[in-house]
Amino acid sequence: MGRTNTSDQLNAISDKNTKRKSLALDNEYHNNSSSEDDSSKIELSYTIPDNNNIISQETTTSVEDVLSLSSAPQNELRLRKQKSNNQDSPVDLNGVIVDVSKREKIFLKRKRQIDNKHGSDKSKYLSRFNDITFKAKSSTIFESDEFYKTDFFGMYVLFWLATAFAMVNNLIHTYFENSTPILQWTVVKVFKRDLFKVGLVDLAMYLSTYFAFFVQYACKNGYLSWKKVGWWLQAAFDGLFLFFWLWIASEYCLDFPWIAKVFLVLHSLVFIMKMHSYAFYNGYLWSIYKEGLYSEKYLDKLTNGKVTLPKGHTKNETEKVLQESIAFTKYELEYQSHATTENPDDHHVFDIDQTDKSIAKLQQEGLIKFPQNITLFNYFEYSMFPTLVYTLNFPRTKRIRWSYVFGKTFGIFGLIFLMILIAENNLYPIVLRCEIARKLPVSERIPQYFFLLMDMIPPFLMVYLFTFFLIWDAILNAIAELSKFADRDFYGPWWSCTDFSEFANQWNRCVHKFLLRHVYHSSISAFDVNKQSAAIITFLLSSLVHELVMYVIFGTLRGYLLLFQMSQIPLIIMSRSKFMKDKKVLGNIICWFGFISGPSIICTLYLVF
């Protein structure tokens, strides 16, 4: 290994040791927020140069091969950066010095807080990916014993009984007053059209997601480097994946009906999030794993006198840097291997004695499960789990409750039938009226719009609620039961939320967890923004994706949904004001007003204007 590469390796390790210290004191991701001084955020995933010859390097290194050493302000070893033509070097020491000077006050301020919370053991670290914990919970809110024991359980029963009576009434009138057979309904014909082709396209789309696995498999076998090539390939494939399958479903290719288009675009977004989480989670672990191997090898050479240090610098200083690097990498790999047990410890008490064992030994003992997790079966399992966030250890159930699966399957088809019934008898006639109104002059169209809106709200609200139960309660739980996935945290009590940020967290927990880890926290780390800016970035990305779905449905780009979603930001700010602080009922009323009217307003806007 050349002198420049050796210098870059040691420089990167020293750089990351300093950054991790700041991270541990100032960036607790598990609290779902950034620290008080958001300008000090740093990313843990700074990687060392990827060199497959690190382990097989020559047994001796000249004086020039080793970087000059100097002491840092906190008695930490700091390595001076040398000029290098190696473009893979991740180190910018000038930036590190600036970062450390900014964080010194924060370091001292938070040290007591962290020591009180975690103890004074210096081996305590905070993992980058400790923001999400999977828990073994095989029941949802509506299935829990706590829910059945509440005084409001009868209201849930009343909702479904009232729904049943309304649907039976609708069905009776349809049967006796409408001579058209059910299979000839307009909505049913749209639903059935190209059904077999849609299934084949969806299967092909699923199989293409295995690209993410093969990239990681290539990294595992040394065919390519994640840092140099892998992440570029994955990022490019993610973008290509979305637009390719959108094109396949569009009128320019297979010309699927709008229901099929919506299904495929939503499923493609699910696959993209799953691939992204799998790829970049493992990509982060590659940087940690390779750093640990390098530090072990270099420390062994230093201990055995096979590396000559420059004059004026002690062996102890270099050993301290390497030992700290080894301690953290072993901690991180072990944490990620065991952090999602049934009773997880967010900070994963790390046995300092484990640093005496090599990474290979810890792998043999099962304490480190990376990169052994990169197998075809592991990816297949993950692809079947109803989650968008990858980790090394998911909670599992011991058996499949087939009666539970049957109940959820019956609910899936029942809810689909009810949604078709409402769409055919209530929504479709309004859509036809909207098409007529669309041809009117604007002066006549606006009054008609309000009549259409009022007629649209009741049936659209029912479809809105049925969609929630269909996807998050029926489909996801059925998939979870079949795959023995124990964490059923698919939704929270969104119906009781008092602001729209709480609704965003509770309505779709799967997407929320993905955005929290891979958008919100990554924005703080990568772009050095505060938590408010990161929240806006996350909100904007979510809004753009929703607007894309609207474009697929209506074939026009209007931006109505984007505008309405972004308008939630001032509402969130208002909900957190002193005026709204103790007004939970008013906050819930505002939210429910949005739930009831918002979807109908947006739908009719796209149809009429």
From Swiss-Prot:
Inhibited by the protoberberine derivative HWY-289 in a non-competitive manner. Inhibited by miconazole. Not inhibited by CI-976, polyoxin D, amphotericin B or nikkomycin Z. One of its GO terms (cellular component) is endoplasmic reticulum membrane. Residues 1-41 are annotated as: Disordered. Residues 1-15 have a biased composition (Polar residues). A motif (FYXDWWN motif) lies at residues 490-496. GO terms for biological process: cholesterol metabolic process; ergosterol metabolic process. It comes from the Eukaryota. The active site is at H546. Keywords: Acyltransferase, Endoplasmic reticulum, Membrane, Transferase, Transmembrane, Transmembrane helix. Its main location: endoplasmic reticulum. Pfam families: MBOAT. InterPro entries: MBOAT_fam (IPR004299), Oat_ACAT_DAG_ARE (IPR014371). Belongs to the membrane-bound acyltransferase family. Sterol o-acyltransferase subfamily. Sterol O-acyltransferase that catalyzes the formation of stery esters. This is Sterol O-acyltransferase 2. It comes from Candida albicans. The lineage of its organism: Eukaryota, Fungi, Dikarya, Ascomycota, Saccharomycotina. The gene is ARE2.
